[in-house]
């Protein structure tokens, strides 16, 4: 939340770290990214940084290391952060290559204790990252390679990962990371834009991001498939993952 970010930045200004190490799932790492901005620029306003690719130059005081313990957001390798304003019921996606971590530690053993439901939610987030990056108008040969391999890995290994299989958890942790590499350049689509908007809009608690993605993905595939290019790409992704 915005409140968490501001408290964390204040604490950082007190002990002045030269490295910021964020460990956890998407929410704590995303929060730490935003804290990093306000640690280095206390006078900066949140209203300014919600403008895409408008951040001040970071690494004036500290570098950033991200250690992911869930297999979904891939925030450890992306230029994005999502911060919630609970007072307004809004999720703000922050976007700037400045907040891409300097170091990412992707250790599958940290995911072995993930509950099955968390595994499902984060896994659907990773799958959505791949699908949206693959049909994006910003897709390229480089993003396609990561997105397609990520789709195939997730389709094969997510059910086994849900059941707690350690080999599957390893595959999922690596797949979600390459999904992040894919969408960092290929970008995302309306599944994520709707998931961010509706995810924080309910008074009695937000919709978990991966669940929101899962709710919208099928409908968006139907909508996007009205475009011949997107339809062709969806069809190829299905054949590539051996679903037919």
Regions of interest found by a model, annotated:
Residues 70, 130, 220:
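Active-site pre-Tyr helix/loop in NAD(P)-dependent dehydrogenases
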Residues 80-186:
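Carboxylate- and glycine-rich phosphate/diphosphate-binding segment that chelates Mg2+/Mn2+
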Residues 3-10, 14-106:
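Glycine/threonine-rich beta-strand-loop-alpha-helix active-site module
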Residues 4-8, 16, 31, 123-126, ...:
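General structural feature for long, well-ordered alpha-helical segments within catalytic domains
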Residues 72, 181-208:
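Glycine-rich phosphate/pyrophosphate-binding beta-alpha loops
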Residues 200-243:
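Gly/Pro-rich interdomain helix-loop hinge
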């Amino acid at each position: 939340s915005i409140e968490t970010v501001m408290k964390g930045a204040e604490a950082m200004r007190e002990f002045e770290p030269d490295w910021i190490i964020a460990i956890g799932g998407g929410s704590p790492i995303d929060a730490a990214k935003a804290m990093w901005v306000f640690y280095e620029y206390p006078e900066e306003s949140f209203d300014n940084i919600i403008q895409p690719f408008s951040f001040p130059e970071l690494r004036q005081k500290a570098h950033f290391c991200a250690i992911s313990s869930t297999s979904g957001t891939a925030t450890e390798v992306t230029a994005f952060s999502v911060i919630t304003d609970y007072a307004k019921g809004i999720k703000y996606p922050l976007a700037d290559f400045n907040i891409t971590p300097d170091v990412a530690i992707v250790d599958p053993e940290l995911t072995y204790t993930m509950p099955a439901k968390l595994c499902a939610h984060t896994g659907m987030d990773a799958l959505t990252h791949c699908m949206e990056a693959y049909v994006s108008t910003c897709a390229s040969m480089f993003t396609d390679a990561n997105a397609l391999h990520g789709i195939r890995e997730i389709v094969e290994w997510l059910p086994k990962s849900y059941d707690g299989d350690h080999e599957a958890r390893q595959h999922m942790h690596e797949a979600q990371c390459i999904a992040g590499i894919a969408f960092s350049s290929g970008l995302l689509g309306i599944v994520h834009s709707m998931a961010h908007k509706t995810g924080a809009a309910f008074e009695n608690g937000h919709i978990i991001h991966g669940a929101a993605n899962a709710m919208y993905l099928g409908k968006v595939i139907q909508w996007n498939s009205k475009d011949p290019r997107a339809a062709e790409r969806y069809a190829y992704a299905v054949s590539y993952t051996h679903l037919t």
